[in-house]
Swiss-Prot record:
Coiled coil: none annotated. Belongs to the xibalbin-13 family. Residues 28-30 form a propeptide. This is Xibalbin-13 2. Negative results: Does not show activity on potassium channels Shaker, Kv1.4/KCNA4, Kv2.1/KCNB1, Kv3.1/KCNC1, Kv4.2/KCND2, Kv10.1/KCNH1/EAG1, Kv11.1/KCNH2/ERG1, and calcium channels Cav3.1/CACNA1G, Cav3.2/CACNA1H and Cav3.3/CACNA1I. The lineage of its organism: Eukaryota, Metazoa, Ecdysozoa, Arthropoda, Crustacea. Keywords: Disulfide bond, Ion channel impairing toxin, Neurotoxin, Potassium channel impairing toxin, Secreted, Signal, Toxin, Voltage-gated potassium channel impairing toxin, Voltage-gated sodium channel impairing toxin. Disulfide bonds join 34-49, 41-54, 48-65, 56-63. It is found in: Secreted. Probable neurotoxin. Strongly inhibits voltage-gated potassium channels (Kv1.1/KCNA1, Kv1.2/KCNA2, Kv1.3/KCNA3, and Kv1.6/KCNA6, with the highest toxicity against Kv1.1 (85.1% inhibition at 1 uM)) and mildly inhibits sodium channels (Nav1.2/SCN2A, Nav1.4/SCN4A, Nav1.5/SCN5A, Nav1.6/SCN8A, and BgNav). Induces activation of protein kinase A type II (PKA-II) and MAP kinase Erk1/2 in primary nociceptive and non-nociceptive sensory neurons. Does not show cytotoxic activity. Does not have an impact on Ca2+, cAMP, and NO signaling in the cell types analyzed. Expressed by the venom gland and the whole body.
């Protein structure tokens, strides 16, 4: 009986650890899975890393993660 309780306790500890990893990963999702500077972002415009935003040309194509210009940094 004691062995079964020990196994249950270990199993529950593992579940708690895995859930905390999943929650932490979701909270840090932008930092872990962001699109870097000068990379294509047309399919996910809100996924650029911090300090960057998705800029496209006049026709809405060739979208890339870029930093804000001088005027954009002041605003």
């Amino acid at each position: 009986m004691k062995e079964a309780n020990t196994r249950r306790y270990i199993y529950l500890c593992l579940v708690v650890v895995l859930l905390s990893i999943i929650i932490t990963t979701e909270a840090e999702d932008d930092r872990l899975f962001c699109i870097r500077h000068h990379k294509y972002c047309g399919h996910r415009p809100k996924r650029c890393c911090s300090g960057l935003f998705c800029r496209c040309n006049t026709f809405g194509t060739n979208c890339r993660c870029q930093s804000k210009g001088a005027l954009g940094k002041l605003i």
